[in-house]
């Protein structure tokens, strides 16, 4: 009997983690998946990254859930819209399992819909700690649901301490590293040519997201980072923040610094290009988890 997995992705970074899992599912004779992009993937404001997914896989459904507002209230409403959208998708697809990654509002909405429809949930990257924002409580809330694929032994132990049965917890490593290990990154020459960089000189990579419990500080925090960037004066690749509350305020600040010729800004990059630029960078600045895991 073939089991159908509904795989959910809402952001460019999350898709980079999900892709190697989907490739592994494709190779398994008793598994198949339906892929459901949502939220930032469908937004022109954040690079319309669904086009990158379409190069790799067939898309079975989408959930348009992202409100164009920069507040916690908008995030809460997006979760509600997403929960409704995913319930419709599950009714149509009838999955045996829902696969989600991490701690954002998109997997949270997908998990809420699944648990009330009695669909098992497989959660990757549970049991981890985030210093600030709503990410950690959201992650731990998802962690209370069904099957857990932890990236480290420490995360697995944390999940078990939260009361989850040991048989539900598996240590599988960080799937984002599979791409680094199994796929070829772009060459130094190709990255330099494509993004008009001089990689004989130091390169700074900046990726900073809003802290959702410090929304009012988002503009100031981005300004502080960019003032430091200007002070360094290195050629810089700067990628837009995510769509959480405060993200649009940060983008307004970023646009003021685009006047500096050594700062190149991008709404989004393909996962391979992002890893390739990271591989060439001398310094990475910001608060992206990729600066801890992939870097």
Predicted regions and their residues:
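Donor-nucleotide binding loops and adjacent catalytic segments primarily
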Residues: 53, 186-280
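Conserved nucleotide-sugar phosphate-binding/catalytic loop shared by glycosyltransferases and other
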Residues: 32-75, 85
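A generic structural motif
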Residues: 28-34, 233-235
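A nucleotide-sugar donor-handling region in carbohydrate enzymes
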Residues: 42-47, 144-220
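Structural beta-sheet core signal
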Residues: 7, 35-37, 100, 123, ...
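A donor-sugar binding/catalytic signature common to diverse glycosyltransferases
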Residues: 100-101, 108, 123-124, 148, ...
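Active-site and donor-binding regions of nucleotide-sugar-utilizing enzymes
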Residues: 4-9, 16-26, 65-166
């Amino acid at each position: 009997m073939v089991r159908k997995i509904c795989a959910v992705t809402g952001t460019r970074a999350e898709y980079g983690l999900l892709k190697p899992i989907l490739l592994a599912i494709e190779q398994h004779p008793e598994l198949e998946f339906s892929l459901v992009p949502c939220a930032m993937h469908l937004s022109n404001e954040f690079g319309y990254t669904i086009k990158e997914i379409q190069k790799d896989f067939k898309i079975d459904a989408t959930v348009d859930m992202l409100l164009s507002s920069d507040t916690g209230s908008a995030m809460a409403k997006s979760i509600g819209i997403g929960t409704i959208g995913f319930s419709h998708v599950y009714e149509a697809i009838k999955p045996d399992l829902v696969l989600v990654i991490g701690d954002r509002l998109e997997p949270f909405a997908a998990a809420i819909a699944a648990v009330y429809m009695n669909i098992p949930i497989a959660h990757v990257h549970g049991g981890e700690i985030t210093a600030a924002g709503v990410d950690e409580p959201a992650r731990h809330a998802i962690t209370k649901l069904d099957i857990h694929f932890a990236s480290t032994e420490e995360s697995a132990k944390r999940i078990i301490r939260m009361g989850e049965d040991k048989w539900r917890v598996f240590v599988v490593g960080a799937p984002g590293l599979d791409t680094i290990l199994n796929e070829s990154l772009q060459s130094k020459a190709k990255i330099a040519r494509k993004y008009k960089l001089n990689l004989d000189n130091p390169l700074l990579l900046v990726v900073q997201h809003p802290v959702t419990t410090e929304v009012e500080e988002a503009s100031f925090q981005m300004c502080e980072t960019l003032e430091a960037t200007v002070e360094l004066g290195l050629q810089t690749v700067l990628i837009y923040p995510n769509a959480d509350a405060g993200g649009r305020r940060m983008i307004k600040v970023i646009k003021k610094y685009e006047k500096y010729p050594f700062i190149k800004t991008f709404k989004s990059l393909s996962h391979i290009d992002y890893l390739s630029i990271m591989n060439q960078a001398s310094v990475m600045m910001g608060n992206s988890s990729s600066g801890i895991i992939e870097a």
